[in-house]
Amino acid sequence: VPDRTANVPRGMRRQLFACKSIDRLIADSEHPRQRLAKSLGPWSLTALGIGAIIGSGIFVLTGTAAAGEHFEAPSLLHAQVMDLVLNFIQHGNLSGALLHGRPAAGPAIAVSFILVAVACSFAGLCYAELASMIPIAGSAYTYSYATLGEFFAWVIGWDLILEYAVGNVAVAVGFAGYFKAQLSSFGVNLSDRWSTPVWSEGHLTGAWFNMPAFLVIFLLTLLLLRGVRESAGANNVMVALKIAAILIFLVVGGMLVHPVNWHPFAPSGFRGIVTGGAIVFFTYIGFDVVSTAAEESIRPQRDMPVGIIASLIVCALLYVGVALVLLGMMPYATFASGPAADAPVAFALKALGVHPAFLAIIVIGAMTGMVSCLLVFQYGQVRIWFAMSRDRLLPALFSALHPRFQTPHWSTWIACAAVGVPAGLFDIGDAADLTNIGTLFAFVLVSIGVIVLRRSDPGRPRGFRVPFVPVFPLISVVLCLGLMSGLLLITWIRFVVWLGIGLAIYFGYSRHRSEFAAK
């Protein structure tokens, strides 16, 4: 078999694929100047996962996924990659890929949520094993460094920077719009110049800065600087509030359920259930953030698997409950368009004459959900940078700890600027899909990492073991690649461009400063 790396200088090849041993990773994490405080238990870790997974989507996306949709993409760039490939194979052209249609799942969207939870659990199990085995901040970046080598570690680290930053820019802009709308309902109208993105949908809006989007990031930054214990405590409160809002909806909405609305249960059969699952899959993204907290966990071998798996289970139960109640309150076709599609839960409660106080609770739950998402992803972003800096792939500034709070204070401020300023300037629109492709790519490498470590280090103690290796990790890889193929072509192009920028930085800076550079 020819050596495909034969044209790569031997020294560079050795460095690109050099793996950092788990023992070395753990030893580096114990350095007095770079040691994070350990204060997170299983409840806080589970709350981190719930905080990241459940945003406002539980109140918004369920109705659209149940009702289905039909639309035409404006260009081939906005067509799904899988549709482009299938149309070319079947018809010899690409034009058919512009027509998108997702059949209605109907009340069976609850089954879609269950199937997606099972699919996500394959990746979740892989994260649980590696997080219990390698209790280091860095998540998929650290796991890749231990299994696939420095080059892949850099690629996934750079990918995670994109995932967390772009996702939070989108959430911050969404929060600002929601916040402005709620103030307006009370007669308080914010100036558009200071509460609207400067750039939206390809043109200047005339605004100066989206101040609410920036301020929510700034205030969360102050909280994160205080320490992980304080941040986790605040997240626990917010998670409790949004779960309470969901439970109140389940009780109030449950009294308004008419079983006749559940018929037909699956109007489009299994196809509708599967396509509905493709829509709601991304409501489960976020459980991987728990793994960035491994280094600050008191008992990571036991608690990391609990946090990851428990957060998935809790969120799945809440999603299924909301789906069944919402689609029992009104026929699924009601949520196909208009205000019912934009805010199905609020629409259903208002249409059925529920007291405004309950609507206010839903609003509080949605806004709290967005803030907790912002908090958790800002936290995770900083821990990724911290780990990359400690490995000398980023400047030392990113791993500097505050002498009093023991938090990566410079990284936290840089993350504030990297997310807060773009959130004040741009409405990134469908570029938010970069979060989805970045997450799925991380899932693929983590799943592969489990297989690699089972072969290279089978005797190392594991607090949790994925069953049926390599079958379960391979199922995770196939599912994630399939979902990636369902994303838009423009998303793939943006992703490749971002990785290209990252490779330029790696070969121009990081590779020369890595601890493997001199070896």
Task: Report each predicted region and the residues it spans.
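Membrane-interface "cap" regions at the ends of multi-pass membrane proteins
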Residues: 2-106, 121, 125, 136-137, ...
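Helix-loop-helix junctions that connect adjacent transmembrane segments
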Residues: 20-37, 70, 77, 81, ...
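Extracellular loop-to-transmembrane helix junctions
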Residues: 60-201, 311-314, 495-499, 503
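TM-loop-TM module centered on a large, flexible mid-protein loop between adjacent transmembrane helices
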Residues: 72-105, 142-143, 149, 180-192, ...
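Membrane-interface loop-to-helix entry segments
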Residues: 176, 208-256, 267-270, 308-312, ...
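Hydrophobic alpha-helical segments of multi-pass membrane transport proteins
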Residues: 181, 246-249, 385, 435-462, ...
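C-terminal membrane-solvent junction of multi-pass transporters and transport-like membrane proteins
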Residues: 205-208, 220, 267, 397-409, ...
